[in-house]
Amino acid sequence: MILASEDIGLAASGVLLTSVAAAQSVALVGMPEAQIILAHATLEASLAPKSNSVVKAIGAAMTDVQRGRVGTVPAYLRDAHYPGASELGHGQNYLYPHDEPSGVAPQTYLPEELLDAGYFQPTNHGAEERLGAVADRLRRLRQGESLD
C-alpha cells in the first residue's frame, strides 16, 4: 500500500485499491492460494507508471505549515451563521459553484498568501497527465477565465 501511494500515486490510483484488496484477501484466503493474490498485486504495482507528485505536494504543504506560511481563510468562506458574522464580512460574496455554468466558481479558496504555492505539480505519467489537465482547467476557471 505504501508503494501504491508513495511511488505510483496518481499515475495509477487503482493500484492502491488493488493493494488494499490484496491485503484483505490474503487475510481471508491464507496460504498457499494467497501467493497468487500477492503476485497479482505485485505485478500490477511493478508494471504501473510511477509518480511521487503526491509526496512532493504534501511535503511542500507541510513545510509551509512548519514555517508558519498558512494565511487566513478568505472572508467569503467563513461561517456566516452566527450573530455578528455579516458585520465581519463572513460569507459575503461567496459564489456557489453549483450555480455556475461550468460548476466551478470564479473564486479562490486558498488564503491569499498561498495562491502561488502550486503544491500539486503533476507529471505526464499515466493517468496523472489527465489529472494535471483537470487541475489546470479548474485553476483557470477559478481565476475567471472563459474556456469556451
Language-model features: where?
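Terminal-proximal interaction/regulatory segments of ATP-powered molecular machines
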Residues: 1-104, 111-148
